[in-house]
Amino acid sequence: MDVWINGKFVEAERAEVSAFDAGLQHGVGLFETMHACNGRIFRAHQHVERLAESARMLRMTERLHAEPLVEAAELMLERNKLERARIRLTITGGNLNMLQSTGTSQQDPTILITSQPPTEYPDDFFEKGIGVVFAAGRLSPWTPDAGHKTLNYWSRILALQEAAAQRAGEALWLTPEANIASGCVSNLFIVSDGTLITPPSRHEEPGAALPGITRAAVIELAESMNIPVERRRVPVDDFIGADEAFLTNSSWQVLPVTSVLVRTNAETEEGAEPSIEMRPHSIGEGGVGGTTSDLRSALLACIDRETGDQG
């Protein structure tokens, strides 16, 4: 399997990164995960442009250009003979001394593109939905990297491990005000009284959520289907009381959420100390809702249409 690193295709086992790379030394880096179908990448330019915007805003580099990176990613699909794939584009600060950097770096970044067969998720994920939990930490819209896809994934990995330990498929981040920001690796949508609602991204008021490419596609499709859409804060009670809920990212597309673990007072014997336990609470009727199903079908058709035969 070949990878693309700093302008060259090499075998994955021969790819090299400097021991002084800022991504390795300081965790300074950004990435994009993209979905390829029919040998083409879905909305590749939007992914790369989002990454370039983050690189500028976080003062990593101003010298990223979308077209060469999109071409390199598409060429890699051909070299690795992949019709369907998970594409990962990673950039780091390169050989950067963080203590001497006072503005946007003039150091060339390290750029790595990899491709792999996509993860195959169980059919039950999409036919029955998954359960989620609330992450223990908080996601603030006021931190400099809020809403950017950075390499700083430690807290998210810990939250996902805790979710897996409770047999949940995703952990939801709350803001300091106890509104839902997003999932660890996904954007959240709820459906309430026929309206599609999603927490604001960093482009919309100050939001902590990533402006997801799949999120944007779902919003476009919903509006084309005359489904009302609101981008607003989502308190926990609104999520728990929603008619439907689902998550979006490049790998899942649209993934239904049908339950959430919530804290409840456990029944105890008279005179015993009260205790708290976690119990599943159904979202809506506990099954995949009609709006969720319609939007998933519409998105899959959109992906197939945009990546299909252009000739």
Region spans (language model):
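Conserved alpha/beta cores of soluble small-molecule-handling proteins
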Residues: M1-L172, P176-N179, P206-G207, I219-G311
